[in-house]
């Protein structure tokens, strides 16, 4: 049997097939312009102009703009803004996945790569390859069974001789992990370190892209939105880099407005629903034959008909108004796109030396379109347009940040202002007798919410000092529930679980080489998922000193690195640590001695970083009676849900106080006493059938015994 096999692509131009011609994309205006980064582009040009080792590799963190710098260089090539030796060069982005795809037979991959390299070599420097994620060439194409070489080893000789030019891009981590390990490959490339741009540089880059976003999304982007995107992404998104994270915010906010513009306005939608409801009612009444002859039915039907006609008229008017607004706005965007297209043609004609066509565009077409655009914008600005939003402002950016991080950044609504102003009153309903402690915490929260606090530290950090059972943990729970409408916003760590030295690994993750390295730390992961929360470190004095050392960085800078090197942002957390240290002195009213015991236990650098040490008062009798009434009210509320009604006599409150309260143990024994003595008695009566649903009962103390009797009124 004869098998004739011709390798796929024998006479094909693989470079055109699997490469992306960036020059063509720039000419077709498919590539976004780059503003700034002049030093990096100049360094790229200098390396490409060398005789040997003329292969630059751009190294930087993800999102800093490595690929954009290459595209910026290509834009300069297209506009002839480069030295003579680099004019007319073509830059192809090589797809490594396309290179290896379909190479079924041994030697086919090597033939394909050699065909491409031969074409690049024969171009005499007219073709430059760009390989994004260049670290992937190490090992790509190698097959242990056949002994084939990978791309890196195929490229090395040609790179060394300067026969081909390659631009690479990769991250610092992957460069170190793959390319630095191969010394021969590393020395054939010249590194260009791409740093994250400053906030001002990122803002300049975004201002250059603003027009492209506006044309793509058919919206208007205010400059305040660009400033807000840079500032908010810098402050609230720590895991990513500028300008990528700021660009993402603008793009998402613009997409949100675009989606709203594409759908019907809320005003029209609600009118349509109202019309459907009335039409359904009208049809149902008309089909009802029972009351056909009644005058009231006829009058009501006529009233419904008039109401429907008025609503339909209003709907049609709104739809026409909406369509007109939309048409006017689309006309503005159409003119902007035409101006953009003419600008691209102008650049092309100028680079080609076609000055006749360029002058026609520059002095005739563009001025005419700009005049039309100005007229259309004035007309749109003076007309009423309330049906849909067409602008992206800082509010939309804040909304996107809030959705992605859970941090409330939208402008304070009146309802939220009232909530913050009455925050202390709400918490005082739950936590009794600790007004000073509550006020200290609430004032810090208010400062943080209106952005007066230091932006590089947590919202606030406190040590709650007091004897057991005085409300330290309860205050933290109340704060989470009142502030975030959810007690789950409280992230609690019982520090009795962190008494050993190695417990630090539980908080930030195990170090490399240890079991559990791939898993995240409990503290760092919890804050990454819920960046706006209350952190409670209960009984902090029980933790090992090394555990408290981890908190030093959090309290000072508002950040913490986990075991995998990721920086976690604690700047939107409220940190509360509770402690029973010196509680015996606080019972005697000796605060100075309580602080001395705190200073003996914790290091000065730890205490110095805490915003405030909050003392919890010893519970007075009136406060304890108020707590008892509150606990009985909670019990009554639970019973009411089962249609069981109980009234608690005043002598019961006094009896519970005398039987259960002890200054040394605080309020906790009271809850236990109510559960054991009152709730248990009610449960037994229910099981015995002595309690009926819907009937009221009175619980009182008779001769030091708790009794349940039916109310006379029942």
From Swiss-Prot:
One of its GO terms (biological process) is cellular response to heat. Residues 619-714 are annotated as: C-terminal. Signal peptide: none annotated. It is found in: Cytoplasm. Residues 13-196 are annotated as: NBD1. Pfam families: AAA (PF00004), AAA_2 (PF07724), AAA_lid_9 (PF17871), ClpB_D2-small (PF10431). SMART domains: AAA, ClpB_D2-small. Residues 416-618 are annotated as: NBD2. ATP 2 binds at residues 466-473. Keywords: ATP-binding, Chaperone, Coiled coil, Cytoplasm, Nucleotide-binding, Repeat, Stress response. GO terms for molecular function: ATP binding; ATP hydrolysis activity. Its main location: cytoplasm. Residues 197-406 are annotated as: Linker. ATP 1 binds at residues 60-67. It comes from the Bacteria. One of its GO terms (cellular component) is cytoplasm. Residues 247-385 form a coiled coil. Part of a stress-induced multi-chaperone system, it is involved in the recovery of the cell from heat-induced damage, in cooperation with DnaK, DnaJ and GrpE. Acts before DnaK, in the processing of protein aggregates. Protein binding stimulates the ATPase activity; ATP hydrolysis unfolds the denatured protein aggregates, which probably helps expose new hydrophobic binding sites on the surface of ClpB-bound aggregates, contributing to the solubilization and refolding of denatured protein aggregates by DnaK. Belongs to the ClpA/ClpB family. The N-terminal domain probably functions as a substrate-discriminating domain, recruiting aggregated proteins to the ClpB hexamer and/or stabilizing bound proteins. The NBD2 domain is responsible for oligomerization, whereas the NBD1 domain stabilizes the hexamer probably in an ATP-dependent manner. The movement of the coiled-coil domain is essential for ClpB ability to rescue proteins from an aggregated state, probably by pulling apart large aggregated proteins, which are bound between the coiled-coils motifs of adjacent ClpB subunits in the functional hexamer. Homohexamer. The oligomerization is ATP-dependent. This is Chaperone protein ClpB.
């Amino acid at each position: 049997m004869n098998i004739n096999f011709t390798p796929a692509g024998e006479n094909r131009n693989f470079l055109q097939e699997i490469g992306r011609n960036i020059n063509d994309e720039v000419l077709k205006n498919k590539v976004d312009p780059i503003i700034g980064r002049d030093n990096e582009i100049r360094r790229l040009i200098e390396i490409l102009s060398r005789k040997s080792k003329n292969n630059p590799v751009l190294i930087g963190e993800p999102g800093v703009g490595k690929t954009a710098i290459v595209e910026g260089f290509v834009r300069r090539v297209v506009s002839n803004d480069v030295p003579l030796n680099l004019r007319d060069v073509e830059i192809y982005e090589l797809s490594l996945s396309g290179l290896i795809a379909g190479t079924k037979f041994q030697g086919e991959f090597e033939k394909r790569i050699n065909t491409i390299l031969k074409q690049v070599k024969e171009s005499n420097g007219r073709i430059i390859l760009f390989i994004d994620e260049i670290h992937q060439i190490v090992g790509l194409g190698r097959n242990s069974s056949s002994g084939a070489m990978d791309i890196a080893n195929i490229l090395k000789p040609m790179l060394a001789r300067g026969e081909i030019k390659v631009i690479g891009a990769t991250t610092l981590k992957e460069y170190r992990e793959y390319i630095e390990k191969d010394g021969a490959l590393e020395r054939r490339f010249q590194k260009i370190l791409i740093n994250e741009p400053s906030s001002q540089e990122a803002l300049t880059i975004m201002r250059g892209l603003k027009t492209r976003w506006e044309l793509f999304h058919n919206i208007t982007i205010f400059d305040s939105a660009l400033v807000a995107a840079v500032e908010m992404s810098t402050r609230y998104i720590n895991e990513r880099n500028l300008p990528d994270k700021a660009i993402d915010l603008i793009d998402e906010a613009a997409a949100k407005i675009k989606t709203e513009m594409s759908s019907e306005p809320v005003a029209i939608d609600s009118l349509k629903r109202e019309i459907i409801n009335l039409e359904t009612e009208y049809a149902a009444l008309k089909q009802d034959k029972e009351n056909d002859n009644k005058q009231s039915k006829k009058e009501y039907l006529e009233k419904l008909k008039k109401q429907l006609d008025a609503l339909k008229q209003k709907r049609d008017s709104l739809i026409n108004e909406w369509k007109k607004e939309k048409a006017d706005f689309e006309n503005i965007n159409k003119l902007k796109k035409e101006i953009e297209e003419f600008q691209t043609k102008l650049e092309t004609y100028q680079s080609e030396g076609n000055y006749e066509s360029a002058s026609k565009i520059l002095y005739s077409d563009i001025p005419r379109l700009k005049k039309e655009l100005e007229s259309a914008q004035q007309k749109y600005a003076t007309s009423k347009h309330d049906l849909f939003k067409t602008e992206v402002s800082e509010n939309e950016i804040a909304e996107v940040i809030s959705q992605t991080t859970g941090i409330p950044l939208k402008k304070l609504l009146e309802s939220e202002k009232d909530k913050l102003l009455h925050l202390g009153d709400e918490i005082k309903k739950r936590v009794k007798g600790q007004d000073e402690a509550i006020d200290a915490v609430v004032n810090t929260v208010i400062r943080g919410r209106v952005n007066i606090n230091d932006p590089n530290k947590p919202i606030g950090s406190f040590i709650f000092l007091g004897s057991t059972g005085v409300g330290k943990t309860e205050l933290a729970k109340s704060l989470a529930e009142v502030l975030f409408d959810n007690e789950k916003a409280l992230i609690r760590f019982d520090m009795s679980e962190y008494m050993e030295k190695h417990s630090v690994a539980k908080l930030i993750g195990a170090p490399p080489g240890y079991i559990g390295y791939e898993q995240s730390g409990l503290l760092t992961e919890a804050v990454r998922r819920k960046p706006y929360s209350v952190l409670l470190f209960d009984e902090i004095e029980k933790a090992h000193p090394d555990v408290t050392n981890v908190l030093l960085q959090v309290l000072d800078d508002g950040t913490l690195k986990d075991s995998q090197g990721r920086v976690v942002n604690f700047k939107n957390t409220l940190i509360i640590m509770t402690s029973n240290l010196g509680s015996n002195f606080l019972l005697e009213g000796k605060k100075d001695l309580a602080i001395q015991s705190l200073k003996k236990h914790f290091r000065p650098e730890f205490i110095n970083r805490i915003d405030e040490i909050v003392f919890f008062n010893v519970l007075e009798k009136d406060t304890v009676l108020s707590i008892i009434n509150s606990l009985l009210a909670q019990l009554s509320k639970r019973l009411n849900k089962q249609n069981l009604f109980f009234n608690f006599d005043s002598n019961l409150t006094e009896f519970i106080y005398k039987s259960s309260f002890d200054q040394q143990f605080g309020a906790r024994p009271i809850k236990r006493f109510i559960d054991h003595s009152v709730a248990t008695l009610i449960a037994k009566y229910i099981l015995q059938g002595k309690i009926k649903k819907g009937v009221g009962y009175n619980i009182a103390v008779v001769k030091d015994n708790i009794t349940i009797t039916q109310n006379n009124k029942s």
